[in-house]
């Protein structure tokens, strides 16, 4: 679906509108302001003012604004070149981050399990911004050369491994214009939640976690307006950007027709016991690395069981949303058998090896 991202206003006019009559700002205005920044037409004051005003005026809670900013960002993305024969469904599981819980890297691990179970996964991610260890940090620490992955070899990685990691900084180089200012400002802005909206592959189906329940229907509506179908937006009742292992999770599910269905799920739906979130907390990069290796090697310690079950419910739901599993319980069981089989370790090791080979070939 094409979203109009063109406005006749200048950046100065857009900033004035945000400051004085924000109710008159259109999605096209927001996208045009972002384009001016990406094109290098904004000075430091205008850049900081634009980002700050979007946040203070609540534009991050408007689905039309999020969709317009995402569409403009995608216009400048490096788009992977998939092979004509690659018509199979591509999926993702991703969260906004920023929930404050600092849990283990669940979506990263779940994406690997889902790929080993038979789905084709294009995982979009970045370095840590609000936790101790982001998806890119963890994968790199275990031998993946993520900088070697570019638009020209995504198709090959998917063909070989059914898994690829799309490093946001590689595929969205235009975002470098905002990165330093966002860090220096030090508060959340609408750009903090754009990640799930701007996977350059534009997956066919996905599970998207959000850090607060009010953002759930907003994200679902933004995804729908971008043409996404069979996407599920989730938020644990603790304001967790994943499916909770501790209790209930709210789901906003966009079906084939674009209808958004809101319902609640629980670990009981997956045949998995509940655990306190504290039992699934992330730690340092080194600790998370060791935990992932134990999961892949099927050499769990008793303290790993909660994290294992956390992975099962999130992977199981992705398998359910993607149609591989008829029920959530079946999805969790497929995930468990896949993890125990050693297939996930084999996939990860071969994927990491391929990334290093790409680096050698292009270095």
Set out the residue ranges of the language-model regions.
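Short, small-residue-enriched loops and turns at beta-alpha junctions
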Residues: 21, 37, 55-58, 97-101, ...
């Amino acid at each position: 679906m094409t979203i109009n991202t063109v406005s006749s206003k200048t950046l100065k006019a857009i900033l004035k509108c945000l400051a004085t009559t924000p109710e008159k700002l259109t999605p096209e205005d927001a996208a045009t302001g972002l384009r001016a920044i990406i094109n290098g037409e904004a000075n430091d004051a205008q850049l900081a003012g634009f980002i700050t005003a979007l946040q203070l005026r609540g534009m991050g809670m408007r689905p039309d604004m999020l969709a317009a900013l995402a569409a403009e960002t995608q216009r400048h993305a490096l788009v992977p070149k998939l092979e004509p024969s690659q018509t199979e469904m591509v999926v993702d599981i991703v969260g906004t981050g920023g929930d404050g819980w600092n849990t283990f890297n669940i979506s990263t691990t779940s994406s690997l399990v889902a790929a080993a179970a038979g789905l084709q996964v294009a995982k979009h991610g970045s370095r840590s911004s609000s936790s101790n260890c982001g998806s890119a940090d963890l994968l790199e620490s275990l031998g993946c050369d993520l900088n070697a992955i570019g638009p020209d070899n995504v198709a090959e990685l998917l063909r070989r491994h059914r898994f690829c990691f799309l490093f946001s900084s590689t595929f969205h180089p235009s975002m470098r214009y905002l990165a330093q200012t966002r860090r220096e400002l030090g508060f959340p802005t609408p750009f903090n939640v754009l990640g799930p909206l701007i996977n350059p592959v534009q997956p066919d189906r996905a599970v998207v976690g959000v850090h607060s329940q009010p953002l759930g229907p907003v994200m679902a509506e933004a995804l729908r307006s971008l043409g996404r179908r069979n996407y599920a937006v989730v938020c644990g009742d603790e304001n967790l950007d994943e499916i909770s292992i501790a209790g209930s999770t709210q789901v906003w599910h966009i079906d084939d027709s674009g209808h958004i269905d809101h319902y609640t799920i629980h670990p009981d739906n997956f045949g998995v016991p509940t655990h306190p979130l504290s039992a699934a907390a992330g730690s340092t990069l080194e600790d998370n690395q060791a935990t992932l290796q134990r999961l892949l090697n099927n050499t769990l310690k008793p303290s790993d069981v909660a994290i294992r079950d956390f992975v099962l419910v999130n992977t199981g739901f992705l398998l359910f949303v993607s149609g591989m599993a008829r029920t959530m319980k079946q999805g969790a069981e497929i995930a468990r058998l896949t993890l125990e089989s050693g297939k996930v370790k084999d996939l990860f090791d071969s994927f990491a090896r391929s990334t290093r080979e790409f680096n050698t070939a292009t270095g």
